[in-house]
Amino acid sequence: MAEEGHRAVEAIVMVAEAPVEPGLLAQLLELPVERVEEICSELALSYEAEDRGFQLQRVAGGYRFASHPDLAAYVERFVLEGQSTRLSSAA
């Protein structure tokens, strides 16, 4: 069963528009920054071990979710087809 800190990090990062800095996560969760870093590392490793379609990445001094690189062709197809569908509907 996932610890509340793990679930909270997931929930916050999921809704964030930009990478979330560990210091902000620590403040929101009322945990030391070191513990937040551990939680993020544990989450990233568990997603990789479970061969998930997404990753928790450290970028621009913060954390964000991103699709797994080996699924780029599917994501690209979704983005391109989604764009043409939206354009066709608007016309």
Annotated model-derived regions:
Residues 5-10, 88-91:
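Short, leucine-enriched amphipathic alpha-helices that occur as contiguous helical runs
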Residues 1, 71-83:
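Short, Lys/Arg-enriched N-terminal segment that forms or immediately precedes the first helix
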Residues 43-72:
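Charged low-complexity interaction tracts in eukaryotic proteins
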